[in-house]
A protein has these predicted regions:
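Histidine-centered copper-binding motifs that mark active-site loops
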Residues: 2-6, 13-307, 313-314, 344-392, ...
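N-terminal pre-domain segments of enzymes
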Residues: 31-44, 48, 399-419, 435
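Hydrophobic, well-ordered secondary-structure elements that form the walls
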Residues: 50, 459, 495, 507-510, ...
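Predominantly extracellular/luminal regions of secreted and cell-surface proteins
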Residues: 51-52, 212-225, 440-466
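Terminal connector regions
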Residues: 149-152, 321-349, 556-564
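Eukaryote-biased detector of low-complexity, proline/serine/threonine-rich segments
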Residues: 310, 314-321, 537, 544-549
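C-terminal substrate/ligand-recognition segments
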Residues: 457-459, 463-468, 482-514
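C-terminal soluble interaction/assembly domains
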Residues: 516-546, 552, 561, 570
């Protein structure tokens, strides 16, 4: 039996990496008993100490519960160096288990930080020591808890890995923008409300008397499906305050620059449930990195960032101040900061745009929506013209492959799941300026593996929105926990993700990067660790399974993952052990 998998079994019994709290310095322990700070410090070095605590926090005049690492929300910026090893000692001062997952990092699976998959978790009063060997990458990443719903309540922070050699991205200033949310509700309360009624937080519900331009037949169609065309996000600005680096819009967060400078902004979506549309009115953005991987620079005016994605951009501000806008995809709120040439300089903050409405394309009928008009920016949906929606058989499961379990966990099937890699994201298809799509991304350097895939597989993203059930292939994780998706070591696989739901899902694979099949030549397909699969559509990636071990594979919408949209991927060791 390989030593690798012997280690895995020992880890899950809690036998490796645990120590006492004595290793944590007094300053870290003391911070847990003081007020929780908003914003973060930077930690670096060959040995880094992180202490997980909890307490009360106040955001925009509302109080709530928070998990704080080293006394702050977000937790500290962990700054590392490509080619160097690092030891991270994480002490748990909570009364419950905790963990840290190093999102996007290539490392031995024993230190990936997913309880029950790669290690047993960190018990109250214990310390876990993450031993990361020489880092094989550079770029912008982040870390977060993978225990319970702690991530929602502040247990997250940024990572920067500086390159060993010259950085191809040249800038005069370098800033982190970590996007997240705050709610005064406890995360388990939010989950309970979603289980009782998926539309609980949808404050933009349509009715027969509202001003959304829906025909009577369209309204009857949506009512018959027990759905709403405004059902864009499960949790919205009705409870969330949207944050940048832990700060609400009224905190007036600013990033200083001098005229003529190039400013690098490392944008991390560390939210639990929110997609954001990023723009800086009056300033074009050059996208230079996606999920920590350098891409050929592409100039855009706006881009959508899904939960768990990262994008690095370079901007050249031209006036005294510019507003950085991170508008929630459903347009129920925004996070705001300012690029300022002097302290206190401000630019106008744009109003929220009209709400987005779902369309026939989002229902998996991509070839049937020929309106061609702007049905998003103006808050209008194209009329379906009295189509026979019954004939579309949106709930007809006969077209599903045999590996998909049909049952109450599936309330929709995409009849025509078109490849939506060229879509800019819900609400951005006709906004009158350049919006980034996955098809715009091209790897800056050639990919390492020139082989064509030797195997093709398809995974369906499934759910029942009304009952708040989410899964892969119709099976929640508790039904397949002992049936991982298996890959041979170094196997080259093409994976097609088919979204049989009306929600966008950010799908994340731990421990690997995959290449988006986005129209670029095979050697320059962009590498990512997280991909958005648009409603009713599909997305495809190529994977080289060269990181042995057990890895989490899941939707990064926290409550979807918690409800069952989670699987384990097992990559065999080089000697064939699995």
């Amino acid at each position: 039996m390989s030593a690798l998998f012997t280690t895995r079994r020992a880890m899950l019994k809690g036998a490796v990496g645990l120590g006492g709290l004595a290793a944590i310095p007094a300053w870290a322990r003391a911070m847990l008993h003081g007020p929780i700070r908003q914003g973060f410090d930077e930690v670096s070095g060959r040995v880094i100490d992180l202490a997980v605590g909890q307490g009360a926090i106040e955001v925009a005049g509302r109080s709530g519960h928070a998990f704080a690492v080293n006394g702050s929300v977000p937790g500290p910026l962990v700054r590392l160096k490509e080619g160097e090893a690092v030891t991270l000692r994480v002490a748990n001062h909570l009364a419950q288990d905790t963990s840290i997952h190093w999102h996007g990092l290539l490392l031995p699976f024993q230190f990936d930080g997913v309880p029950g998959v790669s290690f047993p978790g960190i018990k109250p009063g214990e310390t876990f020591v993450y031993e990361l060997p020489a880092l094989r990458q550079s770029g912008t990443y982040w870390w977060h808890s993978h225990s319970n719903l702690q991530e929602q309540a502040g247990h997250y922070g940024p990572i920067i890995i500086d390159p060993a050699g010259p950085d191809p991205v040249q800038a005069d200033r370098d800033y982190v923008l970590l996007l997240s949310e705050f709610s005064p509700l406890h995360p388990h309360t939010i989950m309970a409300k979603l289980k009782k009624g998926e539309e609980y937080f949808n404050r933009q519900k349509t009715s027969w008397t509202d001003d959304y331009r829906l025909s009577g037949s369209d309204r009857r169609m949506w009512a018959g499906m027990r759905m709403m065309p405004t059902d864009i996000a499960d949790v919205t600005g009705s409870t969330y305050t949207y944050l940048i680096n832990g700060h609400a819009p009224e905190d007036s967060l600013e990033y200083l620059f001098s005229p003529g400078e190039r400013v690098r902004l490392r944008i991390i979506n560390g939210s639990a449930m929110s997609f954001f549309n990023i723009r800086i009115p009056g300033v074009r953005m050059s996208v230079v990195q996606a999920d920590g991987k350098n891409v050929r620079p592409i100039e855009v005016d706006e881009f959508q960032i899904g939960t768990a994605e990262t994008y690095d951009i370079v901007v050249e501000p031209t006036t005294e101040a510019h507003t950085i806008v991170a508008e929630a995809m459903d347009r129920s709120g925004m996070a705001v900061a300012t690029l300022a040439s002097r302290a206190g300089a401000r630019a106008p903050v744009p109003s929220l745009r009209d709400p987005v409405l779902l369309t026939m394309t989002d229902m998996g009928h991509g070839g049937m929506d020929h309106s061609g008009g702007d049905h998003s920016n103006m808050g209008h949906a194209p009329s379906t013209g009295g189509m026979d929606h019954g004939s579309m058989k949106m709930r007809d499961t006969s077209s599903l492959p045999p590996n998909v379990a049909v049952g109450p966990g599936i309330d929709m099937v995409s009849a025509n799941p078109a490849d939506r890699m060229g879509d800019p994201g819900l609400g951005l298809d006709n906004v009158g300026h350049k919006v980034l799509t996955y098809r715009d991304l091209t790897a800056l350097e050639p990919n390492d593996d020139p082989r064509k895939p030797s195997r093709h597989m398809q995974i369906h993203l499934t759910g029942n929105m009304e009952r708040y059930m989410w899964s892969f292939d119709g099976r929640k994780f508790n039904a397949v926990a002992d049936q991982p998706i298996r890959f041979a070591y170094n196997e080259r696989v093409r994976v097609k993700l088919v979204n049989d739901t009306m929600m966008a899902h950010p799908i994340h694979l731990h421990g690997h990067f995959f290449e988006l099949v986005n129209g670029a030549d095979r050697m320059h397909q962009p590498q990512k660790h997280t991909v958005i699969v648009q409603p009713g559509g599909s997305a495809t990636f190529d994977l080289t399974a060269d990181e042995p071990g057990d890895w989490a594979f899941h939707c990064h919408l926290l409550y979807h993952m918690h409800a069952g949209m989670f699987q384990i991927v097992t990559v065999a060791s080089p000697d064939g052990e699995a």
